[in-house]
């Protein structure tokens, strides 16, 4: 006998919708719990089975917390700006807004079919002007506080996409989407000064409960380095340049210097003989992406400028080279090379026959760079010193001589905040003909994205908005002409603050009401994929800290606990993708097995954080378990089974209380697979009984309800209840019922285990000795032997010594 999910699931989804069951309660007498999913980008492909894994996890927590008497905020929304919709519009001539709306409708249908307990009244959409009004407002505040500025930046320009890409969107010199060639080109861009928050972004990782590997990824991305900035003079010139080094103690081993090909001094210092070679090399570098330039495995390339610098610590002349592995945007765009003790410098020196001088004892620098530590040699006043003392002594000397100073640098760059795209938030800025730049007045926000009948690249590198002359060109009341900013914001903008808007989504006066923000923040648990470890999470933390500084939000950090679910792979352990043809559509699973089966299966596959292959057999196993519950509790006629009675059953007492305790604990700690195992153990025990107390059945159904909510609601109704199960108080357990009153005793002959028995904990030595001697296996082993001694350790063992 099986239940009909096709009838049951729509019935309860309709009930929840009509009764607004999951509307967020804001009862001042209750604690609050905020469970957040990384909101999806509504793609044309729709939901895949990877999406519901994280969503089911937050849903289980949300449903449990409601039953535990908390106000629960569990919202959903759409990260709906983005390149695919624009690409689709350019390719087909359709409107990205209409395309996005269709995709959202499809995602909504799919998500509702899975029975998630979202509060749909709080649904948000980053492309809604009432939403992006506040994204624009945050940009204006950043600008007013000196954290948004314009700069000429060498960017990743992709002519085929007609846009500039962030470094992360470029893979091996090609665009991540579409695989088109990418070139370096200087362009006017908006930047956000995330570097101003580098130390706080680093230090405040200690305030949050996040996976250590994610914290490490952020620490490495921020990349704080302590060292010294050193000034080098250029021979026969008044020019100087600075280099940053974490090892100023190795200056005596600096035998050449390298500039980034874009360094402004190259033009001035290159000798006439080297000019042609230098120009040719610079052209070659323009075609390379940052990743190609810094690839450790590639052959080193470079060219000599003909000029020399003076090493400030020993007065030596050292040649100045240019090479693509030095990037203008990192450090000062120039490095001092110590080839004896750095692998990259060593390879470069070997390739071009440059001097290699060891300044640390150890290794054989004729064969390879020595990157270990040892006492200093060939280093004048640093000779014999160990690393830490030598660094201090070198910096002290540089500061005394006025040619260097202590310095902290970061790998983190400012955030490139503009995109040459149509389908994004307009940046609320006007550039006037007299050179002034002003913000669109706050009371005029939102600055609406204009409708475009045809979206096509402008061809100039500007966004398609540049084609909309009526929108772009403006005149102020004094007749002064201006142009609106044609760049739009990146997709990261709307997702950097969306969790705040859920708290008060209809507020037209502010991002959200201050009191409400204080009640709900920080987010209690945030679940999503590890692929957002750096960018989204770093950007959201940066905006949150800025909003904290200007008094908008009450907390330093947005997300208290972060959890990354693993990836659901195809049946052959490969990533699911359209190109591989191994994507599983949840619609098909819901149709065949039901949403509860999908939810149960995804939670039972293995630990939530593990990446696991999809398996149809596992899906069938999950459905069989739900059918097994149904058969145990419900008759063919759909009424409550006769074996469910009001009578007590001592045989199930311990199993029930153990289940309540462990399942609650496992759910709290996101160990859903082991929680489900406990539900299965209880059902196995219940099948062995002639009667099952109704109270235990109700408790079981409540524990099942966060995982399989439709089936649980149906069973709850069959149990005689007229209200939803969603707010019934969570089951409790009695610790005294869990006390073990029995214990396993090991029985030994001459110290070797021969048998094991389970006995009452209270048995004394004499009783244990008697039981041991009467045990059949012990009798066999003692036959024909004389007992010399009996050792009894109550609660543990009986050892009979015999010969």
UniProtKB/Swiss-Prot annotation:
Biological process (GO) annotations held by this record are: leucyl-tRNA aminoacylation
Family matches, as SUPFAM superfamilies: Anticodon-binding domain of a subclass of class I aminoacyl-tRNA synthetases, Nucleotidylyl transferase, ValRS/IleRS/LeuRS editing domain
The record's subcellular locations are: Cytoplasm
Q: What is its main location?
A: cytoplasm
Which UniProt keywords are listed? Aminoacyl-tRNA synthetase, ATP-binding, Cytoplasm, Ligase, Nucleotide-binding, Protein biosynthesis
In which residues is ATP bound? 578
Gene Ontology cellular-component annotations: cytosol
What GO molecular function terms would the record report? aminoacyl-tRNA deacylase activity; ATP binding; leucine-tRNA ligase activity
Instruction: Name the reaction it catalyses.
Output: tRNA(Leu) + L-leucine + ATP = L-leucyl-tRNA(Leu) + AMP + diphosphate
Q: Where does motif 'HIGH' region map?
A: 40-51
- Cited NCBIfam families: leuS_bact
- HAMAP family membership: Leu_tRNA_synth_B (MF_00049_B)
| Protein name listed in UniProt | Leucine--tRNA ligase
């Amino acid at each position: 006998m099986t239940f009909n999910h096709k009838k049951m699931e729509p019935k309860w989804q309709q009930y929840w919708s009509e009764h607004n069951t999951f509307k967020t309660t804001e009862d001042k007498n209750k604690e609050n719990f905020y469970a957040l999913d990384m909101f999806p980008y509504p793609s044309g492909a729709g939901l895949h089975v990877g999406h519901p894994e994280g969503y089911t996890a937050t849903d289980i927590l949300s449903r449990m917390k409601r039953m535990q008497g908390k106000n629960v905020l569990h919202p959903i929304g759409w990260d709906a700006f983005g390149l695919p919709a624009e690409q689709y519009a350019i390719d087909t001539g359709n409107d990205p807004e209409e395309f996005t709306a269709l995709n959202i409708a499809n995602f909504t249908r799919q998500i509702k079919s899975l029975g998630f307990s979202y509060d749909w009244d709080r649904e948000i959409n980053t492309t809604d002007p009432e939403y992006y009004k506040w994204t624009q407002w945050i940009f204006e505040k950043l600008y007013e506080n000196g954290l948004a500025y314009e700069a000429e930046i060498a960017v990743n320009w992709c002519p085929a996409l007609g846009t500039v890409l962030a470094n992360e969107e470029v893979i091996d010199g090609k665009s991540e989407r579409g695989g088109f060639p990418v070139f370096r080109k200087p362009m006017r861009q908006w930047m956000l000064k995330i570097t101003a928050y580098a130390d706080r972004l680093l230090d405040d990782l200690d305030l949050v409960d996040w996976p250590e590997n994610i914290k490490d990824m952020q620490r490495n991305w921020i990349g704080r380095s302590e060292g010294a900035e050193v000034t080098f003079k250029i021979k026969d010139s008044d020019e100087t340049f600075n280099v940053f080094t974490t090892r100023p103690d190795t200056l005596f081993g600096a035998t050449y210097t390298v500039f980034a090909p874009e360094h402004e001094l190259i033009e001035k210092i290159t000798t006439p003989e080297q000019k042609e070679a230098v120009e040719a090399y610079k052209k070659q570098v323009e075609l390379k992406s940052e990743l190609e330039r810094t690839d450790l495995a590639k052959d080193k390339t470079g060219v000599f400028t003909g000029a020399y610098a003076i090493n400030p610590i020993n007065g030596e002349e050292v040649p100045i080279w240019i090479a693509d592995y030095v990037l203008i945007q990192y450090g000062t765009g120039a490095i001092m090379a110590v080839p004896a003790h750095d692998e990259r410098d060593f390879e470069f020196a070997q390739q071009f026959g440059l001097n290699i001088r060891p300044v640390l004892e150890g290794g054989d620098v004729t064969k390879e760079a020595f990157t270990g530590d040892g006492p200093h040699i060939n280093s004048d006043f640093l000779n014999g010193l160990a690393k830490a003392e030598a660094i201090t002594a070198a910096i002290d000397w540089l500061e005394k001589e006025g040619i260097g100073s202590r310095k902290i640098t970061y790998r983190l760059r400012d955030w490139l905040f503009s995109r040459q795209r149509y389908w994004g938030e307009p940046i609320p800025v006007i550039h006037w003909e007299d050179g002034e730049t002003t913000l669109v007045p706050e009371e005029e926000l939102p600055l609406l994205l204009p409708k475009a009948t045809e979206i096509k690249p402008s061809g100039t590198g500007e966004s398609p908005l540049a084609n909309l002359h009526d929108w772009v060109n403006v005149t102020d009341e004094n007749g002064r002409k201006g142009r609106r900013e044609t760049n739009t914001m990146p997709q990261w903008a709307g997702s950097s603050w969306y969790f705040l808007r859920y708290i008060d989504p209809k507020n037209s006066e502010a991002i959200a009401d201050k009191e409400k923000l204080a009640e709900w923040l920080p987010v209690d648990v945030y679940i999503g994929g590890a692929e957002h470890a750096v960018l989204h999470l770093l950007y959201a933390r940066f905006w949150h800290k800025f909003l904290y500084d200007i008094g908008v939000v009450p907390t330093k950090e947005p997300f208290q606990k972060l959890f990354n679910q693993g990836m659901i792979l195809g049946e052959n352990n490969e990533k699911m993708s359209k190109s591989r043809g191994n994507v599983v559509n949840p619609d098909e699973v819901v149709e065949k097995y039901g949403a509860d089966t999908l939810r149960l299966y995804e939670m039972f596959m293995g630990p939530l954080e593990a990446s696991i292959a999809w398996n149809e057999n596992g899906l069938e196993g999950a459905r069989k378990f739900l059918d097994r519950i149904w058969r145990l509790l419900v008759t063919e006629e759909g009424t409550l089974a006769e074996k469910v009675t009001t009578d007590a059953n001592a045989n199930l007492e311990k199993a029930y209380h153990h289940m309540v305790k462990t399942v609650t604990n496992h759910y709290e700690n996101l160990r859903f697979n082991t929680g489900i195992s406990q539900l299965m153990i209880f059902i196995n025990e219940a099948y062995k009984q002639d009667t099952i107390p109704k109270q235990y059945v109700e408790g079981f159904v409540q524990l099942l309800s966060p995982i399989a909510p439709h089936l649980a609601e149906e069973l709850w109704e069959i149990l005689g209840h007229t209200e939803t199960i969603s707010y019934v108080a969570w089951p409790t357990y009695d610790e005294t019922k869990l006390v073990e009153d029995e214990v396993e005793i090991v029985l030994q002959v001459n110290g070797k285990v021969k048998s094991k028995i389970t006995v009452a904990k209270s048995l004394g030595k004499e009783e244990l000795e008697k039981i041991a001697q009467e045990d059949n296996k012990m009798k066999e082993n003692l036959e024909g032997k004389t007992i010399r001694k009996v050792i009894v350790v109550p609660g543990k063992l009986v050892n009979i010594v015999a010969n």
